[in-house]
Amino acid sequence: MPEQREKKKKDESDSVRAEGVVEEALPNTTFRVKLDTGHDILAYISGKMRIHYIRILPGDRVVLEISPYDTSRGRIVYRR
């Protein structure tokens, strides 16, 4: 019987967390977010936020996870 391989979960340390303000709501639940550092990022809503119907509006403060591979895109993981 072959050995079962353990599934590797994405390590949260791979992504960078940042905070910013939603500037604009774009189609397909995409948002333009201005980070506290001044950079603009395109961000989408995480799956848990979609499931729980958490609404995001322009002006909301949000926490993002940004991939180190593409720093111009991110995922919104929390609304403050």
Curated annotation (Swiss-Prot):
It comes from Deinococcus radiodurans (strain ATCC 13939 / DSM 20539 / JCM 16871 / CCUG 27074 / LMG 4051 / NBRC 15346 / NCIMB 9279 / VKM B-1422 / R1). Residues 6-80 form the S1-like domain. It is found in: Cytoplasm. Keywords: Cytoplasm, Initiation factor, Protein biosynthesis, RNA-binding, rRNA-binding. Belongs to the IF-1 family. One of the essential components for the initiation of protein synthesis. Stabilizes the binding of IF-2 and IF-3 on the 30S subunit to which N-formylmethionyl-tRNA(fMet) subsequently binds. Helps modulate mRNA selection, yielding the 30S pre-initiation complex (PIC). Upon addition of the 50S ribosomal subunit IF-1, IF-2 and IF-3 are released leaving the mature 70S translation initiation complex. One of its GO terms (molecular function) is translation initiation factor activity. Pfam families: eIF-1a (PF01176). Component of the 30S ribosomal translation pre-initiation complex which assembles on the 30S ribosome in the order IF-2 and IF-3, IF-1 and N-formylmethionyl-tRNA(fMet); mRNA recruitment can occur at any time during PIC assembly. The lineage of its organism: Bacteria, Thermotogati, Deinococcota, Deinococci, Deinococcales. The keyword Metal-binding does not apply. This is Translation initiation factor IF-1. Gene3D superfamilies: Nucleic acid-binding proteins. The gene is infA. GO terms for cellular component: cytosol. The keyword Cell membrane does not apply.
